């Protein structure tokens, strides 16, 4: 049981208590259900790869978003990973295409632009009729570094913008940190 708990703890966002709950839940399931769970994990690992265009997760050479003729071709939203893409898709606001970098520039961790999907992004911009690139990267040192690098690299080809950052809905101003408040002020928009 300790091995199972340890494996669950390795998953992002899973602490010791949640790992223990998951392990106990699985151990109380019928063997066939556990086998189906294990088969689904193995199948996902072997059958899911990356879209050859945007690098989002896909079981096919091209993901559903890249294949969708209803999406706006001239608009690319750059994200760090597929989790960010899925979060944006949940809003149902963005109707363009995506490009998944596969991480963020982090010199401290030895991750430079050459380890990310930057070269294919530049190639897409040169080959496709791109009218704007939107950077939707985490508001962190790494996200800011990556955004600055990409903005300098891509501005000669097309306009580059970055999503606004600010206060989450329902939050109290007094609990927000200075950087968040500063960004919220900088990203303000006039009321219609």
Swiss-Prot record:
Main function? May play a role in DNA repair. It seems to be involved in an RecBC-independent recombinational process of DNA repair. It may act with RecF and RecO.
Residue span, Toprim domain: 74-168
PANTHER family to which the protein is assigned, alphabetical: RECOMBINATION PROTEIN RECR (PTHR30446:SF0)
Family per similarity comment:
Belongs to the RecR family.
Keyword tags: DNA damage, DNA recombination, DNA repair, Metal-binding, Zinc, Zinc-finger
Q: What is this protein called?
A: Recombination protein RecR
Please state the residue ranges covered by C4-type zinc fingers. Answer: 51-66
Please tell me the species this chain comes from. Parasynechococcus marenigrum (strain WH8102)
GO BP terms, alphabetized? DNA recombination; DNA repair
Name one molecular function that GO assigns to this entry.
zinc ion binding
């Amino acid at each position: 049981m300790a091995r199972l708990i340890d494996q669950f703890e390795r998953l992002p966002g899973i602490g010791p208590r949640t790992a223990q709950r998951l392990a106990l839940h699985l151990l109380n399931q019928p063997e066939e259900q556990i086998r189906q769970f294990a088969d689904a994990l193995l199948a996902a690992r072997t059958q899911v790869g990356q879209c050859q265009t945007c690098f989002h997760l896909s079981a096919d050479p091209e993901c559903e978003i890249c294949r969708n003729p209803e999406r706006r071709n001239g608009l690319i939203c750059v994200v760090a990973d597929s989790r960010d893409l899925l979060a944006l898709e949940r809003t149902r606001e963005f109707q363009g295409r995506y490009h998944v970098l596969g991480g963020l520039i982090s010199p401290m961790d030895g991750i430079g632009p050459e380890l990310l999907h930057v070269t294919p992004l530049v190639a897409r911009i040169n080959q496709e009729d791109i009218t704007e690139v939107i950077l939707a990267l985490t508001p962190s040192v790494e996200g800011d570094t990556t955004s600055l690098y990409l903005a300098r690299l891509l501005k000669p080809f097309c306009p580059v913008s970055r999503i606004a950052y600010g206060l989450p809905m329902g939050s109290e101003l007094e609990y927000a940190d200075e950087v968040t408040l500063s960004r919220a002020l900088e990203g303000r928009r006039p009321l219609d």
